[in-house]
C-alpha cells in the first residue's frame, strides 16, 4: 500500500498572512477575530501573523499574490464579505474574487485559503461571521494550518 498524507492542526512555527477587505468591515472584522482565534488556539504566535487590509474584496487576489510570492509565509488567508444587492455587481465581484484567489494559490504553490463570505443578505453574512453558522474566518485559518502542514509533508 502507498503512503497516505495529511496535515496536522499544529501551527507552531508557521507564518500566516491574512488579507482582509475593509468593505463591510462590520462583518470582516468578525472574520478577522475568528481567524486570529483559530491561529492562536492552534499555536501560531501573534508575531507570526501579519494582516494586510485592502479596500474591497476585488483587491484581495492582487495583495494575496504579492504575499504568497514573497516567500515569507506558509499560507495566506483571504477574508471578505460580498453581499448581494439589486444590481449584477455581486455576481461579477464574487466570481472574480473566487477565481483570483484560486489562481494565486495555484500559481504560487502555496495554500491561499478562500474565507470570503458571499451572501444573499446582511443577515446571512452575519450568521456566517460568528453567529448561527460558525465563523468562516475561524474555519479558513484552521484550513490554512492544515494545508500548510500537508504541503510540508509532501516535499
Swiss-Prot record:
CDD domains with a match to the protein in the record: Lumazine_synthase-I (cd09209)
EC number: 2.5.1.78
Function text: Catalyzes the formation of 6,7-dimethyl-8-ribityllumazine by condensation of 5-amino-6-(D-ribitylamino)uracil with 3,4-dihydroxy-2-butanone 4-phosphate. This is the penultimate step in the biosynthesis of riboflavin.
Keywords of the record: Riboflavin biosynthesis, Transferase
Residues that, per the record, bind 5-amino-6-(D-ribitylamino)uracil: 23, 57-59, 81-83, 114
Residues at which (2S)-2-hydroxy-3-oxobutyl phosphate binds: 86-87, 128
Pathway per the UniProt entry: Cofactor biosynthesis; riboflavin biosynthesis; riboflavin from 2-hydroxy-3-oxobutyl phosphate and 5-amino-6-(D-ribitylamino)uracil: step 1/2
Record's protein name: 6,7-dimethyl-8-ribityllumazine synthase
GO cellular component, as recorded: cytosol; riboflavin synthase complex
Domain of life: Bacteria
Catalytic activity: (2S)-2-hydroxy-3-oxobutyl phosphate + 5-amino-6-(D-ribitylamino)uracil = 6,7-dimethyl-8-(1-D-ribityl)lumazine + phosphate + 2 H2O + H(+)
Molecular function via GO: 6,7-dimethyl-8-ribityllumazine synthase activity
Pfam families, per database record: DMRL_synthase
GO biological process terms, semicolon-separated: riboflavin biosynthetic process
Source taxonomy: Bacteria, Bacillati, Chloroflexota, Dehalococcoidia, Dehalococcoidales
NCBIfam families the UniProt entry points to: lumazine-synth, PRK00061.1-4
Annotated source species: Dehalococcoides mccartyi (strain ATCC BAA-2100 / JCM 16839 / KCTC 5957 / BAV1)
Gene3D superfamilies referenced in this protein's UniProt entry, alphabetically: Lumazine/riboflavin synthase
Active-site residues, record numbering mapped to chain: 89
Family: Belongs to the DMRL synthase family.
